Curated annotation (Swiss-Prot):
Disulfide cysteine pairs (residue numbers): none
Gene that encodes the chain: lpxC
Pfam families: LpxC
SUPFAM superfamilies cross-referenced by the UniProt entry: Ribosomal protein S5 domain 2-like
Organism of derivation: Cronobacter sakazakii (strain ATCC BAA-894)
Protein's GO biological process: lipid A biosynthetic process
UniProt protein name: UDP-3-O-acyl-N-acetylglucosamine deacetylase
Binding site for Zn(2+): H79, H238, D242
Function comment: Catalyzes the hydrolysis of UDP-3-O-myristoyl-N-acetylglucosamine to form UDP-3-O-myristoylglucosamine and acetate, the committed step in lipid A biosynthesis.
Record keywords: Hydrolase, Lipid A biosynthesis, Lipid biosynthesis, Lipid metabolism, Metal-binding, Zinc
Recorded GO MF terms: metal ion binding; UDP-3-O-acyl-N-acetylglucosamine deacetylase activity
Reactions the enzyme catalyzes: a UDP-3-O-[(3R)-3-hydroxyacyl]-N-acetyl-alpha-D-glucosamine + H2O = a UDP-3-O-[(3R)-3-hydroxyacyl]-alpha-D-glucosamine + acetate
Cofactor(s) in the UniProt record: Zn(2+)
Active-site feature positions: H265
Length: 305
């Protein structure tokens, strides 16, 4: 049986909030089977829980938030959510003593290290996957995203940025997903932004944690970070990282082929909601026999050692 995963032990890290610029303590806790992914704000009394749920997602200019029925929110969840998807973590409590998850270096890599450090524990309950049965597509102007049936998890993402720093040949990225491929090829890709946007936001008391330490920063001509890019195509790889996190907001790894053109958080979420709303387009599946599991979701070699 393919089993649900959680952490072996509690781990903690500190970082800076992208919005406030203040120190945030992040605590990742193991959780029992069928808990799902729960984000928790401990700065509120009593603490407020935000279960990962496609319908709770709000996309803002700076980040993805989860918002509850009382309009309380937790921000900047997308990169940690991508790390959870990458390692196939089904059950976890994510605690922060702030309104947001720390931005760390703007990628998912620090969260991957934290999860690997905690260790992955298998629970004696079958892991549920969402399997795509029919093609579902959403559009917004010339942007679109779609899922098709496929026995695995493949991603094909194209961006269209007319910018001297982004070579035309580096605007498409395709990948057959696996935990190892995610860690090596996607997790280190950082978020990016324009210097002028960051300066404007900071002049209004926003994005106070934004810096060269947590993003690729560009002006109209070039990348301003002294160390340059981690990959030639880091921009499109980061958009794929975002998509992996966005699509895991249903709390389950998805079996299907994802293709997107110029998509972002809002359209990725619209696709996920469109799939879930169409009952005949998907089904929950479990695997009694590991041999039947799509290669994409085999346990990562270094994690379950």
């Amino acid at each position: 049986m393919i089993k649900q995963r959680t952490l072996k032990r509690i781990v903690q890290a500190t970082g800076v909030g992208l919005h406030t610029g203040k120190k945030v303590t992040l605590t990742l806790r193991p959780a029992p089977a069928n808990t799902g992914v729960i984000y928790r704000r401990t700065d509120l009394n009593p603490p407020v829980d935000f279960p990962a749920d496609a319908k709770s997602v709000r996309d803002t200019m700076l980040c993805t938030c989860l918002v509850n029925e009382h309009d309380v929110r937790i921000s900047t969840v997308e990169h940690l959510n991508a790390a959870l998807a990458g390692l196939g973590i089904d059950n976890i409590i994510v605690e922060v003593d702030a309104p947001e998850i720390p931005i760390m270096d703007g990628s998912a890599a620090p969260f991957v290290y934290l999860l690997v450090d905690a260790g992955i524990d298998e629970l004696n309950v079958a892991k549920k996957f969402v399997r795509i049965k029919e093609t579902v597509r959403v559009e917004d102007g010339d942007k679109w995203a779609e899922f098709k049936p496929y026995n695995g998890f493949s991603l094909d993402f194209t961006i269209d940025f007319n910018h001297p720093a982004i070579d035309a040949s580096n605007q498409r990225y395709c990948m057959n997903f696996s935990a190892d491929a995610f860690m090596r090829q996607i997790s280190r890709a950082r978020t990016f932004g324009f210097m002028r946007d960051i300066e404007y936001l900071q002049s209004r008391g926003l994005c106070l944690g934004g810096s060269f330490d947590c993003a690729i920063v560009v002006d109209d001509y070039r990348v301003l970070n002294e160390d340059g890019l981690r990959f030639e195509d880091e921009f499109v790889r980061h958009k794929m990282l975002d998509a992996i996190g966005d699509l895991f907001m249903c709390g389950h790894n998805i079996i299907g082929a994802f293709t997107a053109y110029k998509s972002g958080h809002a359209l990725n979420n619209k696709l996920l909601q469109a799939v879930l709303a169409k009952q005949e387009a998907w089904e929950y599946v479990t695997y009694e026999d590991e041999a039947e599991l799509p290669l994409a979701f085999k346990a990562p070699s270094l994690v379950l050692a």
